[in-house]
Amino acid sequence: SVSDLDEVLLGSVYIPSKEEVQDLAWGDIGWWLHILDDDINTVITDQAENRIWNSAMNSAYFGYTTWQMEVGRSYKGDELAADNALWDDLYRRINVTNIILDEIEDLNPATEEERLDALRVRGETHFLRAQFYFLLVNIYAQAYDPENAETTLGIPLKLTGYVEHDKDKASQFERVPVAKVYEQIVKDLKAAVDYFTQSPQTRLFYRASGEASLLLLSRVYLYMQDWKNAWQAADDLLKIKSSLKDYAVVKDEDEVISRTNPEILFSQGSLNVQNAFTGNGGDFCIANGLYRLYADNDYRKELFFTPASSSDSIALGRKYKRGLHQSYVSDLFLLRISEAYLNIAEACAMLDDPSGASDWLNIFRRNRIEGWQDVSYDQNTVIEEVRKERRRELCIEGHRWFDLRRYAVCRKAPLRKAIERVFAVYDWDSKMKFMRGEVFRLEIDDPAYVFSIPKSVLEFDTDMPDNVRPMRRLTEVINANFD
């Protein structure tokens, strides 16, 4: 029945939220997206806090945050963690969406209520399949470049509910072109919007909706550099829902992104950063490059960040609830209205409409910056302004790494940058004293902007082409004396 399929959707497709994420590495699949980009760094101070450095920084974080050839490789080189968790998890969930979409075809709803429920379940299923494929293609394939998306290797695209196995083939699944994956994502999101139009979602927030589908669709079109459609999807959403949270009225004890935030359209999964980015020795901190983007009258500067308690670094502040708790909002699978303003502003900027882009930025900033005076940008400055605003607002929400990838292939205004990561090494066997900082560099157009296909997948599908990542060695050593 429809209600059975609804239960399957809830139990096997939506990502549940965890209680008490002790450390980033204990979070959901994809937790490492937060430590790849230029918004964070590690902390150099006289002494590490034992808890963090001894376990996670050495074993779980090193390979990801310094863009190693093997992301699961520990700092000392003696451990190698599996790299297939995200791939396996999302393809398993996708497989269930395929089964649901197959089975719902065979149902004959007996009542009008059942008919509407079936439409809603279809909408949710198409949305989730799209969201999962979108994440996969942006991790395991190159960014969408309109010039070559038809020929660039994407990821396996499975849309059937049955098991496909041909014993005579060395490879069961082939990597289809990036363009084909995006085509399917757009198709799924349009289907979701259509089903939700006929049968609107009543349980917002933790269940997919037409609004969430429109927002994700506008993001997908941005990644495709299809500016007109990105504009249209964002505009369609903002006509339905456009309320921004006024950051001026966030109370001293409240976090910005919580269950009561009116901007949130959808969330699934956990808050991985409950205990992360403390800015203390042995942990990560917020990068100066990000922190310096906020003017002193920008409410976000004090809301999102705070000085660390035991170093001169910047810690993550009250963007999310801090300390161990049951997750109510995700930092990776979150969709909120703010993004629609930034998406439509970017689309305007790319369509040579600087005044339209300026208008959207001004409306947005009135809710973010004290005493904001409207500014009218010209075509020469507006794209950079939109990108800066996106970085300010959406930091630590799983956007920045993907934005850097897509900016690098942007036909209209390419932005390519190298990233340097200082990896702080402490004497983890005894006194936790700082030893040295090792600098690693992600070059412009570096192959490590794409993840290798997991080893276990290549062992099963022996003919599948891999994404080759280079060996990465440190480029310099930083010594600091705290005596």
Locations of regions flagged by a protein language model:
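Conserved, well-structured interaction surfaces
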Residues: 63-140, 176, 193-201, 325-335, ...
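Short coil/linker segments at helix-helix boundaries
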Residues: 139-183
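Short, solvent-exposed loop/beta-turn-alpha elements that line the ligand-binding surface or hinge
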Residues: 61-86, 164-172, 414-425
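Membrane-proximal, proline-rich intrinsically disordered regions
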Residues: 1-52, 290, 372-376, 380, ...
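Short, surface-exposed recognition loops and adjoining beta-strand edges that mediate ligand/DNA contacts
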Residues: 6-11, 15, 44-46, 140-158, ...
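Inward-facing hydrophobic residues that define packing positions of alpha-helical scaffold repeats
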Residues: 94-97, 182, 189, 234, ...
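Extended ligand-binding clefts on enzyme/binding-domain cores
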Residues: 15-35, 173-176, 180, 224-235, ...
